[in-house]
């Protein structure tokens, strides 16, 4: 009887762990240090081409101002998409999910995400954290 209870408990715990892992497919794609002067040369290159359906942006250290973002797909014609992003993110703030329009069956993978922007209200460089969801 004890072994039946142990097996049942083990299966229940395994199911809980399995479902928790599947429920959260959010992955930290990278962190970019934002300079104090406006620049459009900020790029996050993904070492492994990854299917990403949407992203979130977070200001981990300092406030930042963004003037643009684009996502580049691994494709024969170097397809890209401009993203609609908020112009300002305060320290500790995270944006809503920003959808990335991939192809119809969502099989196109992201190779690079570029940003234009800079740190505001700080002498230190702000950090922009990029979180992806597949």
From Swiss-Prot:
Organism superkingdom: Bacteria
Signal peptide: 1-23
Keyword match rRNA processing: no
Keywords assigned: Signal
Presence of keyword Zinc: no
Protein family membership: Belongs to the UPF0412 family.
Name the record gives this protein: UPF0412 protein YaaI
Classification lineage: Bacteria, Pseudomonadati, Pseudomonadota, Gammaproteobacteria, Enterobacterales
């Amino acid at each position: 009887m004890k072994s039946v209870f142990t097996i049942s408990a083990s299966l229940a715990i395994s199911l809980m762990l399995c479902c928790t892992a599947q429920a959260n497919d959010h992955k930290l794609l990278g962190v970019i240090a934002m300079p104090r002067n406006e620049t459009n040369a900020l790029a996050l290159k993904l070492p492994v081409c990854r299917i990403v359906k949407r992203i979130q942006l977070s200001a981990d250290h300092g406030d930042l101002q963004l003037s643009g973002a684009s996502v580049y797909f691994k494709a024969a014609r170097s397809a890209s998409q401009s993203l609609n992003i908020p112009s300002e993110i305060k320290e500790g703030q995270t944006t809503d999910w920003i959808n990335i329009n991939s192809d119809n069956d969502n099989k196109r993978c992201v190779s690079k995400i570029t940003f234009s922007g800079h740190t505001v209200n700080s002498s230190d460089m702000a950090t922009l954290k990029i979180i992806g969801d597949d």
